[in-house]
């Protein structure tokens, strides 16, 4: 077998010399990992003997792991490679410059500027101006006339500056997004055993020979072989396309592959392949090679099928066969289909993007119409004036001069469009989001999808988990019911009969994940550290409080000796472990929710430690007198029980039979204190108009008590607290289908959903989002930590995954990761989201004022004076101010607490409120009045020569310089006004906290002074006197005074004002719209979202361009995810075989018949899961039962959530 790309294998002599020290080579391990199931078992047995022998050859211990010696680790990296997939090579700066030059508007400006430049050197024969009319400068100004080329050159220079600024911006943005991705990579760690210690190691540092601890919810970071496992089931659909979960056992299928998800159980594996040598890495390498070949073919203009490349890959080595499920179709047709499929089904845009798209299209249309009218009127004016009124003949020698005039008109028209179209919007969005994302990291929010940031600003509802989010996730047993006695404090060991104490200790120590541990405190006098499942840590702490050593018990009964483990899942809602008794027979330890466990018990231990009957009446009394009082104090109640099998070995698949007739040992009450900062955070949410709902698996009384402590419920409230069963009864019809009408009667009053499953959470979230009751449709945020929370996290407008307690599966489904698992971080995300929304609105208010004034001035000037008072280069400068600098200044305003004192904007509230419209029109009136006054009377007011109707190549005039200077200074001071959009009087509030804003305003003012005083002919400016400067400055400051006048006018009194920028319920872009350009969509995403701001949109195809900008920006961060480590590689949608299916399932509503079938499948799945084979991999073999399972991404699919 050959390596698909030569650089993949360490080929240097050092690596080769080290390779001999290990009992197997890199190629041996790669060949082994290509095998599956029985083939793999046979190969291991024939060539290595056993998995333990492989560990011996790799010089690692199955129990202790590697020693962690740096020299040994480096040797392994040399021989077997690093656990890293090389990122795609970034584009060079010159490539980015070339990309920026492709913009249609810039090309038009370049061509027009070049024509203007060439024609400016032409003079009509005879040297008399009258030949072609009064279109060139007077004879005495011939020297000045010789410099007519400067305007064309200045436009070219402006284009070059724009191109370089664009390229630099693109480069810096890509660098920033790569930095964000590397931060996400660093956050990804995996449990590795080194030197006998379980440590969390960054994924990139894993080497071949490491012993990895695998648990449910993990995304496997490398290939490996199972050493020991408990009920381990893997979702391999990302590699094989198989939706059914694969059970992994030592004797049937021990091969674990990178990029696959652990859906159930736990175990240990020895790492055998990492990085580009793992199965995922090999696929990545092959696909990358094909992409390069395709790119080369495109460059050469060849039109050959990609199937040829794939066939070559298959003949190169057998590894290519592993990726067949990813490419089931062949030939040209399949490639076309795959390209379309990779774009996925209709993508729903975020609320802000939808509103911006509609607004930008409207503005773009208006700008296009105005620019066309401007050019037509200028041409008509010129033609009528010269050839009709003055009756001149069109002379051949004057044609270049006329063309030069037409080019000038055309340039004016293009510059009107440059100013009119809001190409600064993408930059404002990008800067605001990038700034917010960077700052949100400090507030413990790791944003994975940029648009989730602004969506949080619209959130109207938050469905939060309880454990770890609202509470501290530090479990402590504070009460217990043992042997008929309710202990309000932890009992002393002497108070308990010896046999009862032994049963409590053994049941807790053995029947819990061996990864759950209590470690010494990091600081002297601190609390012991809890590692692993926090509920189990609380129980182990109870054992420690009873003065017992749980490690000693586990040493006597190591994990390898456990006969069988029934891991926790949402169907069982309990965990059980089977062990062999020394005297023969079996003992089953079981723990779970107290009500569920008590129903399975028919006997109980008494005070003396004897076993007595436990009748229904006794159970009811226990619930009433023990469990409910514990729950009302906010304690989680866990039941512990056991059962002995002394006779014939039972059928371990029949769980219903095994888990009946249990003996109740104890019921414990576990306290998980509410985080001290949570009540205040929930009060902030209430004040901000956000409803907080708690969704938990706990007892309804426990949930109600915690909700009251948090402030979700207050005494006297008329709100609902429901259990999952009651919730489903209320919302489903006789057929078991969810009815939206019924759900709409429940969710507005629902505040607590207890004893809920992940399916219930998904149903609730979907129901709230799909509901149409009320003025505004709901925007829902959801928190989740379990594998099963994936569907709800995907369905929610914003999904929050827990960074500490969350599984990899939950994190991959989320939009934002809470690095501290704290609810207050969600409130901070709301604040940042609203700040993004306000930043965009501030920028819009500013930009639309400039748009309205500049377009009307250019249009009116063209119609009346046959010239625009603002020249092309000046317009480009104004555009640079209002686009680049203004977006930088207004999009980086820090958030304030005042953002949380108003209600959410909602989905349908317009971007431009009536107050903003008042501000826009009010300031436009002031600016237009001043500009027109200066244009038509400025020469008299300042006693200077008029600049109106100047000849074609005349020198700059003081008159029009004052117009330009005043116009820019008015925009500068209006930028300060634009800091407030809700009618606030003090526009300077907090301005000194925003250093960027102050720097931009002062920097722009300084540049304006240089342009006027030094810019000269290229900027059509001439020097101004100090008095003229003072007047310009005074008029500019007048903007601030005028702003106070506008804010004093009540908005309600202006009935004629309309709102703008409304959002529809669901903004969608169809596949047809996506396919308008044949350029690779993934390549366009980063380019469009980041480049369009400076170089301008395509003014000819404004509508299409603007729609595509905001659509592609939704996924801009995905382009930046150059896979640094293998851990995140398989999360990329283009490599997920079932992506389209899963997305369509989540995004489209089910038809009643489909929903019914899904539920039938779910019931079958649940029923058969209970009876399936759960034998521990180290125990006796049993018959395997086929499971009828729904799709892994289905909302109805049930996986596990911790107790």
Curated annotation (Swiss-Prot):
Gene3D superfamilies listed in its UniProt record: Calcium-transporting ATPase, cytoplasmic domain N, Calcium-transporting ATPase, cytoplasmic transduction domain A, Calcium-transporting ATPase, transmembrane domain, HAD superfamily/HAD-like
GO molecular function: ATP binding; ATP hydrolysis activity; calcium ion transmembrane transporter activity; calmodulin binding; metal ion binding; nitric-oxide synthase binding; nitric-oxide synthase inhibitor activity; P-type calcium transporter activity
Transmembrane segments: 93-113, 151-171, 357-376, 410-427, 841-860, 871-891, 912-934, 953-974, 994-1015, 1026-1047
Tissue: Ubiquitously expressed. Not detected in liver. The highest levels are found in uterus and stomach. Isoform XA is found in uterus, brain, stomach, small intestine, colon and pancreas. Isoform XB is found in uterus, skeletal muscle, lung, kidney, spleen, stomach, small intestine and pancreas. Isoform ZA is found in testis and isoform ZB is found in testis and heart.
Domain of life, per lineage: Eukaryota
Alphabetical list of CDD domains matching this protein: P-type_ATPase_Ca_PMCA-like
Membrane topology, as annotated: Multi-pass membrane protein
Residue positions, PTM Phosphoserine: 13, 328, 334, 1064, 1070, 1144
Extracellular-facing ranges: 114-150, 377-409, 861-870, 935-952, 1016-1025
Primary location group: membrane
Region (Calmodulin-binding subdomain B): 1104-1113
Biased composition (Basic and acidic residues): 334-349
Chain residues that bind Mg(2+): 785, 789
NCBIfam families named in the record: ATPase-IIB_Ca, ATPase_P-type
UniProt name for this protein: Plasma membrane calcium-transporting ATPase 4
Organism: Rattus norvegicus (Rat)
